[in-house]
Every structure is written in C-alpha cells, then in structure tokens.
Amino acid sequence: MNLSIVVAKVVRENAQYKYKLVGKGERYLVQHQEGDNSGNAVMKYLTPYAKEPVVIEGVSLQKHSEIVESFGEVIYKAVVQHVVEDFDTGRLHKSKRNYFINGDSYSDAYESLLAEANNWVGLFEIISLSKTNIIEVLYDNCN
C-alpha cells in the first residue's frame, strides 16, 4: 500500500448558503494501491459536495509512511527512528518512518503510537509528533 497527500481546491457552500472557494486547498491523506491515481479518489469523494469541478493541485507520495489505526478528529504525524541490530555483522541499522495517527489531543496520538510500538522489533525513538492540516484519511481500493 502507498500513502499520498493530495491537495484539492473545491468550491463549497458556507453557513450563509453562498458558495466559497477554499483558499489554499484542502489536504487529504489517501491510502492506495501502487499505480493507482490517488487524486481520482479525492475527486470522487469531493464531487458530491462541490458546486464546481474539483481541482487537484498536487499529489505527493509519502515514502516510508503508514497509518496507525486510531480514533479522533485531528490527524497527527509522528516521525520515528527505528534501530535494528544485524545479528550477522553486529551493526546497527537506523531508519526513519512517518506515522499518521488520528487523535483528539497530542496525548491520544502519543498513546496510540505507543500501542502500535508493541508490534515493532528493536529500539525506537520518537523524534517528533505534530498536528497536521490533513482533513481526512481516504482509503482507495484497499482490499
């Protein structure tokens, strides 16, 4: 599975029933199969809510990233450095991974990340945990 961040401009209805173009675009995290166009998933999702056609401004593939399944309204991004020892050579191998976590607060996201850490092998260090401006996580053709 691949993860991509898709930025889309959309005209939405606001509280006064007037239509408004979303300024800088909305960001969506899309989990998709390799080779699939993640922008199409966002367009399909947003089209019923948009007055005019949705414009995809950009798509960026998130390498070395995964989603931690959790509940919450805000999406956080954690950068974690993993350290694994090669038993044949005795060398330590370090790699960084990004984890996207739903939570209502930093502590919720941190606890969800630590729960996920029970499945990891080797040592790890949480380098950063920050709030993102991603609106929603979409799953496209993920069976």
PLM-predicted stretches and their roles:
Residues N98-S128:
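Mixed-charge, glycine-accented linear interaction segment located at domain edges/termini
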Residues S38-K44, S107-E111:
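Short amphipathic alpha-helices within nucleic acid-binding modules
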Residues V22-V30, N40-T47:
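Short N-terminal helix-initiation segments at or just after the protein's N-terminus
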Residues M1-Y28, E69-S95:
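Short aromatic-glycine-(Arg/Gly/Cys) micro-motifs in beta-strand/loop hairpins
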Residues R12, M43-H82, A117-N143:
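Short, mixed-charge low-complexity intrinsically disordered segments
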Residues V11-E13, S38, V83-E85, D104-Y106, ...:
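Generic structural motif
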Residues V6-A8, V30, A78, I101, ...:
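Hydrophobic beta-strand residues in large extracellular and virion-surface proteins
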Residues K24-D36, H93-D104:
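A short, exposed loop/beta-hairpin motif centered on an aromatic-Gly-Thr core
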